[in-house]
Amino acid sequence: MSSELTPLQRSVLDKYRFLAESLRELSETLSDLNNTHEDSKPEAILQEMREIEVKISLVSTLLKGSVYSLVIQRRMDHQQKPSDL
């Protein structure tokens, strides 16, 4: 049957196979996480998630500040170059 498939059909089937494998791996990972934190209280897990959220927010703010600084610096460099000519 596979010899009757077009290249596009083979490609789609390969992508579905890859997706199925990824979902299986995700399911195993989630199962492992559930078993690992079986003894943890929901409040403790929630507190850990809040701490992670704060850290992610801080990293995001620092990244935005860095990008903004680079944009301003390039804009200033660009404005200075034409005046030097």
Curated annotation (Swiss-Prot):
The keyword Chloroplast does not apply. Its main location: nucleus. InterPro entries: DASH_Dad3 (IPR013965). GO terms for cellular component: cytoplasm; DASH complex; microtubule; mitotic spindle. It is found in: Nucleus; Cytoplasm, Cytoskeleton, Spindle; Chromosome, Centromere, Kinetochore. One of its GO terms (biological process) is cell division. Keywords: Cell cycle, Cell division, Centromere, Chromosome, Chromosome partition, Coiled coil, Cytoplasm, Cytoskeleton, Kinetochore, Microtubule, Mitosis, Nucleus. Residues 13-41 form a coiled coil. One of its GO terms (molecular function) is microtubule plus-end binding. Belongs to the DASH complex DAD3 family. Component of the DASH complex that connects microtubules with kinetochores and couples microtubule depolymerisation to chromosome movement; it is involved in retrieving kinetochores to the spindle poles before their re-orientation on the spindle in early mitosis and allows microtubule depolymerization to pull chromosomes apart and resist detachment during anaphase. Component of the DASH complex consisting of ASK1, DAD1, DAD2, DAD3, DAD4, DAM1, DUO1, HSK3, SPC19 and SPC34, with a stoichiometry of one copy of each subunit per complex. Multiple DASH complexes oligomerize to form a ring that encircles spindle microtubules and organizes the rod-like NDC80 complexes of the outer kinetochore. DASH complex oligomerization strengthens microtubule attachments. On cytoplasmic microtubules, DASH complexes appear to form patches instead of rings. This is DASH complex subunit DAD3. It comes from Kluyveromyces lactis (strain ATCC 8585 / CBS 2359 / DSM 70799 / NBRC 1267 / NRRL Y-1140 / WM37) (Yeast).
